[in-house]
Regions:
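Long, charged N-terminal accessory/stalk domains
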Residues: 1-343, 373, 377-384
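Conserved, carboxylate-rich catalytic/transport cores that coordinate ions
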Residues: 1-6, 18-21, 25-32, 264, ...
Length: 633
């Protein structure tokens, strides 16, 4: 059922805006829209977005230290009251500040350690040099250079000495072997030219009053201090991470505050107002909620205008509501539509899904495995429930067709598809005819409700009669009746099919309509042969898995070792094969069943085009807000 909507305009004093919007968010009764002329948002929006981002960063950082063991069994979200959720907490904000400071400090320490280690590594080749860096400089009579010579040229060092230089050789580093070359000023050009020919690369050491070993020791101590501080900061972060639940609550609080500040409103000097939608049956409850905050407010409600499209909210029973996800993936119903397609579509989807699976064993697996998954993970998503409920349909059709994990453990109630393919095809096409007829019947109902009775009779009913008559021609007992129905319906279509056209189209339009009916419905009916195809493919693969498992199973001639290996191999092939086949069949049934609903069924009457009803409500990820009817006293 599509829930009727009312257009709401709420007027109140400017000073009451924040408490009123909090009350609307608390009750979740009104969807506020951004269509008001001159609308604006709360000035604190950017600030609240920044706060949410900060909490998110702190939560992410704390998560790296939290000692939380993830269980495959998901726990239910903690339930909190809205007022508790929105209560300010100075302590939690201080925790966020401290965590972000620790994160920044750890990042700085990490960069400092990298820099220190790079400096220490650069000094390592010079540790054996017992000269302070500030003493390495030119004099009036000599020139000195420090640098590296590639290790492969070290045997040619005498060439530098022959040119008049003195070479001090130290340890090897990444660039090469560390050397210090001293030469008399008169011979320096020749000496350094000889060094360059050996690949000498000059390095300017820092002018500090330390030897390389002394500076290296200082850097090592500095790195140890930073590492110690880092360990202390990480320990503190681990302690603070024990407050991760408080941080999660704070994140939900800030997210809810952001959503509140995103609300569009307009205002004058003294009054503010918002526009939106609410359920028609919740207007009184909305008015009571507003009066809890202030008596100086006015709630104006009215039916939607012809040029307005309200949001869509569907309300169906527990089972049918799960299949709304299938419709929504096609297009959400338009609230101005006469009918909600979900009830009829959901029943057909359930029936056809079970036929496509067509195996009682697989249906039982769907019920047990998906039911267990729902229980353990607390996942109550619509797609999960569709598979769970379709398991019962699969069991039913599996019993009808006598298929149990690809074997005929019990006689089929109707027939075995593999033994009588043509009859099974006829059943599948028959299901298709009924499915299509139900879509045409929905269109008939819409035409009657919207004041087009002749369209319902001359277009929709005539199509049903024509197809029914043509199908009767295949029965000897009903052939004569089928001829009469076919002739009458063809005549009606030809004579009335062009009634909306002008000129010659009134006479030729009927023939075109007749062709479209025969070709369109004929092609649509043949589309249901895919039910048989999926049924057979799943059954054959299941049989193959059974045969493969049976081939490796031990027999009377198997030894002890062969018996153990054969039994384990057979069981593995059986389990893995059937699980793989089940998953593949589920995917195929989901896709092809959806296709039949979208094209063959919805194509007869449904267009959609709606958008979801999303009332202002708390935006939470980690906790669940308790639903309390605060408006009621």
């Amino acid at each position: 059922m599509i829930v009727p909507m009312k257009k709401i305009t709420l007027y109140a004093m400017k000073r009451e805006r924040k408490p009123l919007l909090r009350q609307l968010q608390k009750t979740g009764l009104m969807m506020i829209i951004d269509e008001t002329e001159g609308a604006k948002r709360d000035d604190n929006l950017k600030h609240s977005e920044a706060d949410r981002a900060r909490v998110g960063e702190a939560l992410k950082f704390a998560g790296g230290f939290a000692q939380i063991k993830k269980s495959p069994i998901a726990a239910e979200k903690d339930k909190v009251d809205y007022d508790f959720l929105m209560a300010q907490s100075t302590a939690d904000n201080e925790t966020v500040d401290r965590l972000l400071w620790i994160r920044e400090k750890l990042q700085i320490n990490e960069q400092n350690l990298i820099s220190i280690n790079e400096k220490a590594d650069a000094l390592t080749p010079w540790l054996d040099m017992n000269v302070s860096f500030d003493e390495i400089e030119d004099t009036k009579l000599s020139k000195v250079k420090t640098g590296y010579i590639p290790e492969r040229h070290m045997s040619k060092i005498p060439e530098i000495e022959q040119a008049g230089g003195v070479v001090g050789v130290y340890s090897s580093g990444k660039p090469g072997v560390a050397v210090m070359i001293v030469a008399h000023c008169s011979e320096s050009n020749a000496v350094f030219e000889a060094a360059q020919q050996l690949g000498f690369t000059e390095v300017h050491l820092p002018k500090e009053p330390f030897t390389a070993a002394e500076r290296h020791r200082e850097l090592t101590l500095e790195a140890e201090e930073i590492s110690k501080e880092t360990d202390e900061l990480k320990a503190e972060a681990e302690t603070l991470s024990k407050k991760i639940e408080e941080l999660q609550l704070l994140h939900d609080r800030e997210s809810t505050r952001v959503k509140l500040n995103e609300v569009s409103f307009a205002e004058t000097d003294n009054v503010f107002y918002v526009e939106g939608w609410t359920r028609a049956d919740k207007v009184d409850e909305l008015e009571k909620a507003v009066k809890k905050v202030t008596d100086l407010a006015y709630v104006e409600s009215r039916d939607p205008n012809d040029d307005e499209k309200p949001p869509t909210l569907t309300e169906n029973n527990k089972i049918i509501s799960q299949f709304e996800a299938i419709t929504d993936m096609f297009s959400r119903p338009d609230p101005r539509d006469v009918v909600d397609p979900n009830t009829v579509m959901g029943i057909w989807y359930w029936i056809i899904f079970g036929m496509m699976m067509g195996d009682a064993g697989y249906g039982l697996m769907m019920i047990v495995l998906v039911g267990g998954f729902k229980l353990l993970t607390k996942n109550n998503g619509k797609l999960v429930n569709i598979i769970f409920y379709s398991g019962f349909s699969t069991v039913f059709w599996g019993i009808m067709f006598g298929s149990y994990f690809g074997e005929s453990l019990f006689p089929a109630v109707i027939l075995s598809p593999l033994d009588d393919i043509m009859t099974t095809l006829g059943i599948c096409l028959g299901i298709g005819v009924l499915h299509i007829f139900s879509g045409i019947a929905m269109k008939m109902y819409i035409d009657f409700k919207e004041g087009r009775p002749w369209d319902a009779i001359l277009d929709q009913l005539t199509s049903i009669v024509l197809v029914t008559g043509l199908l009767m021609l295949f029965s000897e007992k009903l052939k004569s009746v089928g001829k009469i129905l076919s002739i009458i319906s063809v005549a009606v279509i030809i004579l009335t099919g062009g009634r909306t056209k002008k000129g010659i189209g009134k006479f030729t339009g009927g023939f075109l309509v007749l062709y479209n009916v025969l070709a369109g419905l004929g092609g649509d009916i043949l589309s249901y042969a895919r039910i048989l195809a999926l049924m057979l493919s799943g059954g054959i693969v299941a049989m193959v898995m059974n045969i493969l498992a049976g081939m490796v199973m031990p027999n009377a001639n198997s030894g002890v070792f062969g018996w153990i290996i054969g039994l384990i191999s057979g069981i593995l092939i059986y389990i893995i094969g059937h699980v793989f086949n089940l998953v593949l069949n589920l995917l195929s049934a989901y896709v092809h069943d959806s296709r039949l609903q979208y094209l063959e069924f919805f194509g007869k009457f449904y267009e959609g085009g709606g958008y979801a009803f999303k009332p202002l409500s708390p935006d939470t990820k980690y906790v669940a807000v308790e639903e309390k009817k605060e408006a009621e006293q």
